[in-house]
Amino acid sequence: MDIKGQFWNDDDSEGDNESEEFLYGVQGSCAADLYRHPQLDADIEAVKEIYSENSVSIREYGTIDDVDLDLHINISFLDEEVSTAWKVLRTEPIVLRLRFSLSQYLDGPEPSIEVFQPSNKEGFGLGLQLKKILCMFTSQQWKHLSNDFLKTQQEKRHSWFKASGTIKKFRAGLSIFSPIPKSPSFPIIQDSMLKGKLGVPELRVGRLMNRSISCTMKNPKVEVFGYPPSPQAGLLCPQHVGLPPPARTSPLVSGHCKNIPTLEYGFLVQIMKYAEQRIPTLNEYCVVCDEQHVFQNGSMLKPAVCTRELCVFSFYTLGVMSGAAEEVATGAEVVDLQVAMCRAALESPRKSIIFEPYPSVVDPTDPKTLAFNPKKKNYERLQKALDSVMSIREMTQGSYLEIKKQMDKLDPLAHPLLQWIISSNRSHIVKLPLSRLKFMHTSHQFLLLSSPPAKEARFRTAKKLYGSTFAFHGSHIENWHSILRNGLVNASYTKLQLHGAAYGKGIYLSPISSISFGYSGMGKGQHRMPSKDELVQRYNRMNTIPQTRSIQSRFLQSRNLNCIALCEVITSKDLQKHGNIWVCPVSDHVCTRFFFVYEDGQVGDANINTQDPKIQKEIMRVIGTQVYTN
């Protein structure tokens, strides 16, 4: 037994070992000699009452005036694809460990804060970001907090905690602003404009609204794309739960996650509520300065650093950047694809337009300068470093440390550039297993999710109203370096436009594969779209020529690549259909789902029509059987 400290529980366990009882008694008497501030007790009880007994654990030290409080934040409300992309375990709470003065509590020194997941030892970059946020929040609150001030706030709450159960009736349906109940039947909407306007049934409908969510609600199992699961297989997403973060289009909503929760229930409940507000929107803010990202197409799925140089330097020292070794070990094919996209963009005649973002890479020999700086672009030096990045195939066949040493000898900027390529990707990409879309005729098939929680939720809301279907989007591989980091944007009438906009402004799609395959081959000086007959001939020729390598090849063998995306699109009146060319002017109504890559001029079947019931059934089969895990 640890003689230095004890866990403070309501009921002391009775052990049979006399010596153990003796040690516990000595330790308990030491702790009893230290004064424990009653406001601390009150705040702990508030956490237990509002959340659960298991939401807080306390470690008291017998000889020093310190106490550690572990606050457990339930994150099961995160979607499966979000938690996977963010590298967090949604089945395990995030723990906030705060160390206070036992006798002074809020009148004492500002508490230290640690953020962790017990089973997530490596690469918990999200915890570092959340720690910075909560440390900043606590520092601001500590300027005016005191035990006396909090006591007056807490006394307002005590009148509700009566033996007659008034608080239970209150929580059952009167207030939409109270902290999270233990087992609510509906989410808590915290927008002040909705106060008094919504009843309980409307609150349930609020699941579809752009609001943050209680971390303790019990959630039904819903698939990621809103489709019924295949009876023979599991869902793509075992649980889809929770509400999205605020929409950035509304000033009121966009600032919602930074609203300061009430102190009426104590400081511990306040910081838990603030953490719950911030977690779903971490991708919308710079991981260093906590300022909101500004992108043409809104935020992306993965958290990222902003472009400020100071933030870039801090980002490299903060430890939130993905380790290249880990990514190569767990997703080598995805890293291989990312490098290929970067190379295609860098070698394009249009690189000054489409190679965006340009890398921000700290010089390994001088950590105070940028070796690659967006303000001072040097494409030749960048090309030299990229040429020194060894093939991902080689990286998987030997010791990563040895391979890194070889790269460092070739070019000291090669490995830092590889790290940037991996960490700057803001989309979630997973190589599909053998249960892929067979009609696409390529082994290089990927699940591609780039929509942040807010956009995905807006998409689901629109889908419930208008329905959805699938369509192809063709774009040359040189464009995908930017798409993975900035999203699928409306390029019509902008410098990004390459093909014209004969049918108006919007994202161009087609249910017919031959049309999108034509667009996917355009770029790098090729500005004539092949006809359907040419594509069919090419497809037939590529499938009759003996293959020099297996179609099941794990890695890309060629630099001559074509690619095409399969997107889900809302079938509202906004979707303009001009025969087999569709234009969607609302970017929120298009979400990428799958991505396909072809080598050496290969193309898939040019006769595919996503509106064919057989094709739709095949898409549904893959969605139903594709289960990806951490």
From Swiss-Prot:
Residues 394-620 form the PARP catalytic domain. The modification ADP-ribosyl aspartic acid is found at residue 600. Keywords: ADP-ribosylation, Glycosyltransferase, NAD, Nucleotidyltransferase, Transferase. It comes from Mus musculus (Mouse). This is Protein mono-ADP-ribosyltransferase PARP6. Auto-mono-ADP-ribosylated. GO terms for molecular function: NAD+ poly-ADP-ribosyltransferase activity; NAD+-protein-aspartate ADP-ribosyltransferase activity; NAD+-protein-cysteine ADP-ribosyltransferase activity; nucleotidyltransferase activity. Belongs to the ARTD/PARP family. The gene is Parp6. Mono-ADP-ribosyltransferase that mediates mono-ADP-ribosylation of target proteins.
